[in-house]
């Protein structure tokens, strides 16, 4: 049996941009194939701010595995049981919000990795293998190697500890939650502010030092994304289903109104 591979990790390992699309209000599996056809590498299935359930997450995740796009799930802060259930349902990784310290990053890895790297419990019949029977030792080793653990840094405290967070074995991506960071800094929505730029520099430097991938979310302006990619960002949340649909629909309506 071929070993399952995480397409988002593969894209990052090749030195490319791993492009993600947020899933907030889509609840059916079609979103996975649509976003793969659009050219994205991973889904940001949002259980922190979206109304999705673990059931809908599993359905989307299984469709994503078949389509060749990586399902990554953001759970509410500290919800490790939800995180491991999302992984058992087909997730290729967990995005944990508000990781402020290296100790929190270590706890995250401990809960999400199988032994000997952590203490996650294993179950048979995993979607990553098409529900086929696989030796537990083989599944644990492969999934430990292929999953992505993403620590979101969204406060000045987290930025100050970015080097220590990036140094934690098992953390793959340190991702700036730009909107929340600007809010915490008292500069809400000013995503090009000098303090935000300095935070990006700090995270990029920490990731380069510890051979991790720097990531970003919450930035919609393409030119600003271009600027941060030029600084070294590689794991890019490109938007979410709600905003993309609303914006495209508004543009279409304006164009049609202009016909008369």
What are these regions (language model features)?
Residues 1-22, 133-145, 201-204, 208-209, ...:
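N-terminal amphipathic alpha-helix/helix-capping segment at the start of soluble metabolic enzymes
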Residues 54-88, 112-118, 141-144, 192-215, ...:
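Alpha-helix-loop-beta-strand connector modules within alpha/beta enzyme cores
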Residues 1-78, 110, 149, 168-171:
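Conserved N-terminal beta1-alpha1 strand-loop-helix module at the mouth
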Residues 60, 102-118, 243-260:
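C-terminal helical cap(s) of enzyme catalytic domains, especially alpha/beta-barrels
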Residues 38-42, 88-93, 113-114, 167-173, ...:
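Glycine-enriched alpha-helix->loop->beta-strand junction motifs that scaffold or abut catalytic
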Residues 81, 93-169, 178-183:
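Conserved anion-binding
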Residues 23-27, 74-80, 98-100, 152-157, ...:
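Glycine-rich beta-to-alpha transition loops that act as phosphate-gripper elements at the mouths
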Residues 20, 43-44, 95-96, 175, ...:
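Conserved beta-strand positions in the central sheet of alpha/beta enzyme cores
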């Amino acid at each position: 049996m071929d070993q399952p591979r995480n397409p988002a990790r593969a894209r990052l390992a090749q030195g490319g941009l791993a492009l993600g699309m947020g899933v907030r209000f889509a609840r059916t599996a079609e979103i996975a194939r649509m976003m793969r056809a659009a050219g994205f590498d991973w889904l940001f299935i949002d259980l922190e701010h979206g109304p999705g359930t673990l059931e809908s997450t599993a359905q989307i995740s299984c469709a994503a595995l078949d389509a060749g796009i990586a399902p990554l799930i953001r759970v509410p802060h500290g919800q490790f049981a939800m995180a491991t259930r999302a992984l058992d349902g087909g997730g290729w990784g967990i995005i944990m919000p508000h990781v402020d310290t290296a100790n929190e990053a270590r706890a995250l890895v401990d809960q999400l990795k199988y032994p000997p790297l952590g203490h996650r419990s294993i179950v048979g019949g995993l979607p990553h293998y098409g529900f086929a029977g696989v030796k537990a030792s083989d599944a644990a080793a492969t999934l430990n190697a292929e999953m992505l653990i993403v620590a979101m840094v969204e406060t000045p405290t987290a930025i100050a500890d970015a080097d220590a967070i990036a140094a934690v074995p098992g953390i793959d991506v340190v991702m700036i939650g730009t909107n929340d960071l600007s809010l915490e800094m008292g500069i809400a929505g000013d995503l090009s502010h000098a303090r935000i730029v300095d935070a990006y520099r700090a995270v990029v430097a920490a990731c380069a030092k510890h051979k991790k991938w720097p990531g970003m979310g919450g930035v919609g302006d393409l030119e600003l994304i271009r600027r941060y990619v030029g600084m070294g960002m590689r794991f890019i949340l490109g938007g979410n289903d709600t905003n993309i649909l609303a914006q495209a629909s508004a543009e279409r309506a304006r164009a049609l109104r202009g016909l008369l």
